[in-house]
Amino acid sequence: MACNKNAEKSRDIRVEYPISHQVDTVDEYFGTAVKDPYRWLEDDRSKETEAWVETQNKTTFDYLSKVPYREELKERLEKLWNYEKIGSPFKEADYTYFYKNNGLQNQYVIYRYKTGEDPSTASIFLDPNTFKEDGTISLGGTSFSKSGNLLAYSISEGGSDWRKIITMDVVTKNIIGDTLVDVKFSGMSWYKDEGFYYSSYDRPKGSVLSAKTDQHKVYYHKLGTSQDDDILVFGGTQSEKHRYIGARVTEDNRFLIISASVSTSGNKLFIKNLDAPQNPIVTILDHTKSDTYVIAKFGDRLYLVTNLNAPYPKIV
């Protein structure tokens, strides 16, 4: 009954919505006129848009502050969420790692212990909650080198898709200094302990929030060198233009597998022989009619999973 009464009270809260002014913008598509009265909001860097966002936020939080059961709801959610959460362990070199959240931490913390020792001896390896006091820097992806002695991890500042990649010596936990910037929609895949492959777009001119980015590229970064010297591996030509490209090195360091797509479904597959880097990249699959990925390699044979002509994916 109390919840119903509180819900009724929240519905009684009056909201004075701010007015969003309209402009006379009209585009014509195939002979049809389409009005776009809020085109001005597409300029996310303008003073007008900034003022509009501030006004909208003020309206929202003014309303939320008056919801009678807000604190009660917050306390209930905190109680439900406040329990220890531990991820599956994984082994790298001499250590076993796992992700853990004590209950209400904003981000999971990476712990580790010497493999073979009691897991209760685990200590903090990397705590994203300490990246910045206000919590606006988060941990993205992580990738250990083949030996397990090096780590590349990405961070996001303020929720941006444009990330930095940081490299670390996992034995000493010291940052190596090979920090890459302006990396977007990328994993990291190590080649031996010498460097790693990653993907990104050219940094757009103007706003990074609204500018178009549609040509993903794969680069190789060699440790100890400048990002300016990174080698463009794939995606630099019009024929190689794709919206999303990912690359990973096989476990034996012999091949680089490249997956390229123009949307969020369907991908092409390519392979590069890392033992003969001068050789051209070979096409495995030249269409995007299916989702096809390499799942294993034994000797010279690749095993793929695909949904091509297979509603339930098959291994080929």
List the predicted regions and their residue ranges.
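Beta-propeller folds
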Residues: 3-316
